[in-house]
């Protein structure tokens, strides 16, 4: 009887081809069972719907892949009712056991699973037959989180390694030149020009005791150029130390713009001495002078690009901190002045409102019927961060990647293999850091207003929040936040 029933079960599978390569038998935790009826698998993506009141727009966020569930039908069949009951009990105990277990299934193969639910059915007139429906999920293989590189800390460390390598390159490649010759004059002019560029960058940082000290050091260096050009180690140490001093003077906001300016200046100097393929194009007759000047301009450009990449990473850290502070900041309007009577209802037309990008003052009615000025202050946005949206990060990442690629190619063409390797590692870290952490910033969208609206109303219409209306006005170059022109494309940062 048992063999007849098993053959009948397998005959159904054979009609559809399901039993040609499988036996129709399986095990769970080494407890055998027979596979019958349908076997199901389900999966998909974990989507979260974003729907807002009074808005016809919305969307979904993809939170990743769902775990694949497997549901299969099994049975215990035996010619002896007591034996069938014992075998069914053993399978129930295996399904109830804690932890994961090995499932051997003719369709699913051998997989390590955990049981989500199971159901057993039997009939009073068929005590030798037990039908099961079991749902399982794949067990977790990794019991610890994946290790990730702290890119925000790795970028400054790699920047130190790059600048050290650049200093070694300058001191090892530099050749002495004879005093009083045209070659010496050309080299001194090149070094003096580099010092002047650094001095201009420092001069733009303001007037403080630290800035004055660095300016004094640069002036002393400029006065001793004649001796420095024949002391390669001292020259390299002085120039790299000056760049390090500039980096230490800048805060996270001014650092990125400062290194942008320096990189552009050094880029022009480098382009004037080396062609696209690294061919020296200077007009000097001395090969030594040509080589020295080309190496000097390459080292200064590579160092500036290195510090700019480090500044971008630090600016992103500051932007994320700023975003977290703004999320936790109080959002209530603040009264600029005590609530005093400044007029009557009939004199409301004489009151005025002062509008700036940093502050919006509106007239409010006091409890006694007078008027007072209410200020919606842009707390913390007087000095906005360098990066405010994912689009800012994408543009900066592309710019830094292209700039570092150019410097890496120059290093390879001139035979500076150590510099090339260090710069390549820096580029990989910077791009990974900006792309990974930059996703935490808000996204930006482009919209057209149907009509002229105040910035607060326009921002609320597209985001449901008008707290950062000053940012909308600033980033779109709107001089009067009360009048955002309709029909014009504006950038909206949607948090």
UniProtKB/Swiss-Prot annotation:
It is found in: Virion; Host cytoplasm. Residues 407-426 bind DNA. Disruption phenotype: No tail is synthesized. Residues 444-493 are annotated as: LysM-like. Induction: Expressed in the late phase of the viral replicative cycle. Expression of late genes is activated by the viral late transcription activator C. It comes from the Viruses. Keywords: DNA end degradation evasion by virus, DNA-binding, Host cytoplasm, Host-virus interaction, Inhibition of host innate immune response by virus, Late protein, Viral genome circularization, Viral immunoevasion, Viral release from host cell, Viral tail assembly, Virion, Virus entry into host cell. One of its GO terms (molecular function) is DNA binding. One of its GO terms (biological process) is viral tail assembly. InterPro entries: DNA_circ_N. One of its GO terms (cellular component) is host cell cytoplasm. It holds the Pfam family DNA_circ_N. Residues 339-353 have a biased composition (Low complexity). Residues 331-353 are annotated as: Disordered. LysM-like fold region might interact with peptidoglycan to facilitate DNA ejection. Part of a complex composed of three DNA circularization protein N, three baseplate hub protein gp44 and three sub-complex wedge (made of two copies of each baseplate protein gp46, gp47 and gp48) that forms the baseplate. Required for tail assembly of phage Mu and responsible for circularizing the viral DNA after it has been ejected into the host cell. Following infection, the circularized DNA can be isolated as a supercoiled, non-covalent protein-DNA complex, in which the protein N is bound to the ends of the DNA. Protects linear double-stranded DNA of viral genome from host exonuclease degradation. This is DNA circularization protein N. It comes from Escherichia phage Mu. The lineage of its organism: Viruses, Duplodnaviria, Heunggongvirae, Uroviricota, Caudoviricetes.
């Amino acid at each position: 009887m048992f063999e007849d029933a098993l053959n009948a079960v397998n005959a159904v599978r054979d009609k559809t081809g399901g039993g040609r390569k499988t036996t129709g038998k399986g095990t769970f935790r080494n407890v055998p069972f027979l596979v019958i009826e349908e076997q199901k698998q389900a999966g998909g993506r974990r989507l979260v719907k974003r729907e807002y009141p009074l808005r016809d727009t919305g969307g979904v966020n993809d939170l990743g892949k769902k775990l694949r569930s497997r549901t299969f039908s099994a049975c215990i069949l035996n010619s002896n009712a007591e034996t069938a009951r014992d075998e069914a009990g053993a399978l129930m105990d295996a399904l109830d056991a804690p932890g994961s277990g090995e499932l051997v299934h003719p369709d699913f193969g051998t997989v390590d699973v955990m049981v989500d639910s199971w159901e057993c059915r039997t009939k009073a007139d068929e005590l030798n037959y037990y039908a099961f429906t079991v749902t399982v999920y794949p067990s977790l293989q990794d019991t610890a989180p994946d290790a990730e590189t702290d890119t925000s800390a790795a970028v400054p460390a790699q920047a130190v390694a790059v600048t050290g390598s650049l200093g070694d390159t300058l001191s090892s490649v530099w050749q002495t030149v004879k005093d009083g010759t045209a070659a010496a004059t050309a080299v001194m002019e090149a070094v003096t020009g580099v010092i002047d560029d650094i001095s201009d960058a420092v001069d733009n940082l303001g007037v403080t005791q630290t800035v004055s000290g660095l300016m004094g050091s640069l002036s002393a260096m400029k006065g001793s150029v004649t001796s420095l050009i024949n002391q390669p180690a001292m020259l390299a140490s002085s120039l790299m130390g000056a760049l390090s001093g500039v980096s230490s003077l800048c805060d996270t906001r001014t650092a990125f713009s400062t290194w942008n300016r320096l990189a552009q200046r050094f880029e022009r100097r480098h382009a004037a001495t080396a062609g696209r393929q690294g061919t020296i194009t200077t007009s000097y007759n001395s090969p030594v002078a040509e080589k020295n000047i080309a190496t000097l301009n390459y080292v200064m450009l590579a160092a500036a690009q290195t510090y700019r990449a480090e500044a971008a990473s630090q600016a992103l850290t500051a932007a994320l901190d700023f975003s977290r502070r703004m999320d936790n900041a109080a959002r209530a309007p603040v009264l600029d002045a005590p609530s005093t009577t400044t007029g009557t209802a009939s004199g409301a037309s004489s009151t005025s409102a002062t509008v700036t990008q940093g502050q919006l003052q509106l007239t409010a009615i006091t409890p006694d019927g007078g008027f007072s000025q209410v200020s919606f202050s842009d707390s913390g946005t007087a000095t906005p961060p360098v990066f405010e949206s994912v689009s800012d990060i994408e543009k900066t990442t592309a710019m830094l990647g292209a700039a570092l690629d150019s410097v890496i190619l120059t290093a390879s063409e001139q035979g500076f293999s150590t510099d090339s390797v260090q710069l390549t590692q820096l580029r990989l870290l910077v791009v990974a850091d900006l792309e990974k952490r930059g996703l935490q910033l808000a996204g930006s969208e482009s919209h057209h207003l149907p009509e002229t609206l105040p910035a607060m109303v326009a921002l609320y219409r597209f985001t449901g929040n008008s707290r950062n209306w000053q940012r909308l006005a600033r980033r779109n170059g709107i001089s009067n936040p009360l009048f955002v022109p309709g029909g014009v494309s504006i950038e909206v940062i949607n948090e």
